[in-house]
């Protein structure tokens, strides 16, 4: 949604969709992060990180950039996975959460995630 809202805003200059995306991103910023009482895990899709960066670029709100970085840094740190399992759901690979982003050298998990890996290289 964030990428679409930014594209719509850049193409039309209209803020209606962008304002909805901002409201949603603000909720993410209030809910996720390293601070006490917030959820400290990475989302299942890296799409949110890309979208938050694009929102930052059009709004200048650094919270979006910071949250995107937090999500990327959180990958590979969730301690409830069974890292020895070959099952991608049990070891975190399905969600690209099996090891830190900078250590991921191949696209794994659901096929849609291959585009995120390629876009970030």
Language-model segments: which ranges?
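Glycan-recognition and catalytic cores of secretory/periplasmic carbohydrate-active enzymes
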Residues: 2-121
């Amino acid at each position: 949604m964030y990428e679409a809202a930014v594209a719509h805003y850049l193409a039309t200059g209209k803020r209606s969709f962008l304002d909805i995306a901002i409201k949603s991103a603000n909720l993410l910023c209030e809910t996720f992060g390293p601070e006490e009482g917030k959820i400290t895990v990475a989302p299942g899709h890296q799409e949110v990180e890309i979208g938050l960066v694009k929102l930052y670029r059009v709004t200048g709100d650094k919270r979006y950039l910071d949250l995107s970085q937090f999500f990327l840094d959180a990958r590979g740190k969730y301690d409830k996975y069974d890292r020895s399992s070959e099952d991608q759901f049990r070891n975190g690979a399905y969600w690209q959460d099996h090891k830190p982003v900078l250590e991921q050298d191949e696209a794994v998990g659901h096929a849609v995630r291959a585009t995120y890996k390629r876009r970030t290289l």
